[in-house]
Amino acid sequence: MKVECASNIGFCFGVHRAINILEKTASERGGVETLGALVHNQQVLNRLSGMGVRVVKNIDDISGRTVAISSHGVGPAVLAELKSKGLEIVDTTCPFVKRAQVAAKRFHDAGFFTVIYGDVNHPEVKGILGWAGGNGLATLNPQGLDDIPDLSRYIGVLSQTTQIPTGFTSFVKNVIDQALVKDAEIRIADTLCHDIRDRQAAALELAGRVDLMLVIGGHNSANTRHLLDLCKTVSNTHLIETASELQTDWLKGVSRIGITSGASTDETTISEVCSYLDRLSAGA
């Protein structure tokens, strides 16, 4: 049984940067609170907790004088409230998310209605919507635009950073088809994360060459679920968070296994899965 990892695996640039910032802050101050989970990966959060990093869900739950913003970012109203309380803010927002926030603000300042291709319940998308100044919506269904009777003639379109590129392309085409009948002006910003795009391409290429594909990452991680959906189109694929979730009956008749991971999956977790597979292979 041969095991091969995708060429793009482990922490992405944005997560690696956020963790470095948080580890440094926690080390210097003996701990720090984050507004929302830094990343959607429980193993990483457990390790950070051991360093004195505490997750708070609401601003009112902050007990210290320093708070970290997660890699998913926040909207301007949240930033203003944090500043009004005199809190020192440690911003770990991913630069690619920041770019999407800037695009939304640019649309808003130009008088454009912002349409985000993304999950309206995801913290990243909530933050981006905030920068649209309340003049926007998020949806994964382009037909949702039909529900807005007085849709602006001026429409700006962008994407949640972790979405699948082909999905965003299809979404944009559908929005254009709907908007042109309204004599609209449309602006499109490519806000997809380059790392995620490369990771998806590498995973898809590997999935086409193996009998079984394993995606390692948090079950509530958007970019990890997208990898799962993508790999499933070409190979038998399962999502696992740790080696303990791997089921041996998946391996029956399998000679080649491919491994990829979500952008917030750490090297230790990946190594544990690979080691477990090696032990199973040696005992076969």
Curated annotation (Swiss-Prot):
Residue numbers binding isopentenyl diphosphate: 40, 72, 122, 221, 223, 264
Annotated InterPro entries: LytB/IspH (IPR003451)
Cofactor(s) needed for function: [4Fe-4S] cluster
Domain of life, per lineage: Bacteria
UniProt KW keywords: 4Fe-4S, Iron, Iron-sulfur, Isoprene biosynthesis, Metal-binding, Oxidoreductase
Any GO BP: dimethylallyl diphosphate biosynthetic process
Catalytic activity: isopentenyl diphosphate + 2 oxidized [2Fe-2S]-[ferredoxin] + H2O = (2E)-4-hydroxy-3-methylbut-2-enyl diphosphate + 2 reduced [2Fe-2S]-[ferredoxin] + 2 H(+); dimethylallyl diphosphate + 2 oxidized [2Fe-2S]-[ferredoxin] + H2O = (2E)-4-hydroxy-3-methylbut-2-enyl diphosphate + 2 reduced [2Fe-2S]-[ferredoxin] + 2 H(+)
Keyword Metal-binding among record annotations: yes
PANTHER family: 4-HYDROXY-3-METHYLBUT-2-ENYL DIPHOSPHATE REDUCTASE
Entry protein name: 4-hydroxy-3-methylbut-2-enyl diphosphate reductase
